[in-house]
Amino acid sequence: MKKNIKLYLVILSICFQACSQNSGEGQEKTLVRKEKTAFQTSNPWKSVTDVRADVAIVYSIKDHHKKGNMTFEDRVQSWRDRGYNTHFMTGIAWGEYQDYFTGKWDGKMHLDEGQVTQKGDTIWHGKMIPYIVPSMNFIDYIKETVIKRVIDAGIDAIYLEEPEFWARAGYSEAFKREWKDYYGFDWRAQHESAENTYLANKLKYHLYYRALDECFTFAKEYGKSKGMEVRCYVPTHSLVNYSQWKIVSPEASLASMPAMDGYIAQVWTGTSREPNFFDGKEKERVFETAFLEYGSMESMTAPTGRKMYFLTDPIEDWPRDWVDYKKNYQATFVAQLLYPMIADYEVMPWPDRIYEGLYRTSADTDHKEQIPRFYSTQMQVMINTLNDMPLSDNKVNGTQGIGVLMANSLMFQRYPTHEGYDDPQLSNFYGQALPLLKRGIPVKTVHLENASYSKTWEDINILLMSYSNMKPADEASHTHVANWVKKGGILVYTGRDDDPFQSVQEWWNTNGKDFEAPSEHLFQLLGIDPPYLAGEYKVGKGRVSIIRKDPKEFVLEKGKDEEYIKLINNLHKNTLNKGNIVLKNHFVLQRGAYDIVSVLDENSDTSPFILKGTLIDLFDPEIPVLNEKSVKPGQQAFLFNIDRVKDKQKAQVLVTAARVEQERRNKNKYEFVAKSPLNTNNVMRVLIPKSPEDVKITNHQGMNVNANTSWDDKSKTYFIGFENDPEGVNVSITW
């Protein structure tokens, strides 16, 4: 009998281990699925910031937070205890590294490693927090004091954010030392020539590439020694923004770094409201800029297969008013959703400042309040859609296949200016993109660094290119561009090629090459003979059109882009045989049951765009059911289309300002738990077959919760509104 019991226990143990392994596999799959949404915070869990995304990215290893003394590990555990996956983030160009700068770590002061301007001023991010020239010693500090501790805490995803070197910096002793090591000759002041500027910015680029490569390689190796597979990500602004803000960062090159797993695209109102020129006017164009920013991040990673999170922020760093925040949040939110092959999101940074910060109630008052209930409700409806936002093969409506070429060297020519050549507000980039985008053409971006990937060229029929604001890093990229043209691609090259960076000592004018401009090397590969005049040239199965103007000329003055648009239209119609490009004033995309719309201003068509159907308005905190929605120029819309719900007999929450968990269904009953931050309202629309006979809404203690309810017979949806509770509100509906 004892032998039988032992045998039974052995079998039971084996079964239990097998079940545990299967469960582990299931959990692993669930973990992957449950890293769809995230937010970052330097604070522990609080009831008022319980956002209920999948991942809490815990920021900084410092053993403190605003309201008490907690270790880093304590903060991490506070989120784990509430069911969150936990990741880690810190700055790589700045951070609370006072122990490094003041000599506590290695006995040496390192304040001389800050980024310094021509005037001798250190560029500070905060008190005793300089922007850093990332020396190997600093990299060792990050490895030993940050990365090891994070991995020892059981965290397997590390984000080193914002690898930023200011273009105006480059005068510190630390930078001069790195210059000598990298180039083999003494430092040269960047303001003295375009040549020096180019050399300085290439070095800045290299230093942060090296820093990330060293840190990520170490993280993966140290993780493996602990039996962990550590993933490494870079939260970064877009190439569009860094170029416009005059910051140098590795950007696209990181997408091919072996130790790098992905990015967070840090696009929000603060980046997208940077003014640009179009039709002779300099102004904020938040939606359009955000669309190009997200696009440049998506195209940077798509050929490489790296993961991409898109970020939005319901507010911004600069103190403004709630009305302004709401308007621009809607614009950036819609812009991100118009990229249907990205479905992972950082739903917000810094929830503490969003939920607890005080901001003006309107532009014409100094009165400040915490986030209004109507806005927090709307925001939570929006971010909860991201938990199940589907990938989609659908495309934004409009003419497809037109792309603007970008390169990391966009960041190299921004500051300082030389020989009187200026590119106001990155107009040589926007001059290629905005004339199309503003006419309803969903223009793409293409990264020269990704030219070797065949996937880069998928869906690109017409490539818009200029070297007025950037230069190619190597000649191999030209071979890929030329091969694409010869196979049938259409290249539109726009540029006078007279900016001072054309003649910097680089591969196109050294080692036996003597081209006056890098474009001449490309034209030679394409079989075009000097003097490379404006005109059209047949190349293999493709065509090249040369325009001898700088792209900025299309936008700095009113009406100067019309010939440019005509040329592109003629190429699309007569060379591609694809008809006229479609000129319109709106972008529309369907993603599952979601309708995403943006209507453009500054367009000859000033009519609204009208959608019809059974629609829930997700920008309205009352989430009303509409028969149609009219969207005016300069506005966006985000709608749930009930007509596209696949199984209308299945009881389900369609829209909610809370995270829905623990769903249970039977023939005539639907139950679930809703969780969201304290001091916020929940609104939800629940699809059920018919009007409910009984509804019970209770808190986690079983006490009844006051609720507003109503039945909409046409849509077969039940509206429920109540005060949110992070402990959970139980809802039971019987019909």
Regions found by a protein language model. Name each.
Residues L31-T41, H87-G91, Y159-P163, Y198-I247, ...:
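Aromatic-lined carbohydrate-recognition surfaces of secreted/lumenal glycan-active proteins
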